[in-house]
Amino acid sequence: MEDVKIIDLYFARSEDAICQTDATYGKKLFCLAQRILHDEQDSEESVSDTYMKTWETIPPHRPTYFYAYLAKLCRYFALGKLDWKNAAKRKAEVVSLTEEMEL
């Protein structure tokens, strides 16, 4: 389906817009998130968040380049998830004691 028709579905508030977006760009968005996160579940969550944010933001906005708009949102959510996962307090490292410290 063409981007203009998908965007028109969003403006009509048709839930079919999300289905058409997923059918057209779902694999590309998943691959984009997967390259950033290297985790299937987190990638699926980023794509779902992308669809939700698209549903919330498109009626006032009409993006000229629909895939670029979706990719920007997906990248934003994936990088946010990556930052959250790699936060210093959540990342534990095991360090072995040296001989001097064992005494």
Model-derived regions, located:
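Hydrophobic recognition helices of helix-based DNA-binding modules
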Residues: L29, A33, T54, I58, ...
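Residue-level preference for hydrophobic side chains embedded in well-ordered alpha helices
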Residues: T21, Y25, L29, T50, ...
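Acidic, Ser/Thr- and Pro/Gly-rich low-complexity regulatory segments
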Residues: E2-I6
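Arg/Lys-rich amphipathic alpha helix in sigma70-family domain 2
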Residues: K72-V94
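Acidic, proline/glycine-rich intrinsically disordered inter-domain spacer in sigma factors
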Residues: R90-A92, E99-L103
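Sigma70-family region 2
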Residues: F11-A12, H38, S48-F66, W84-K85
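A short, charge-rich alpha-helical start-of-domain segment used by transcription regulators
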Residues: I7-C31, R35
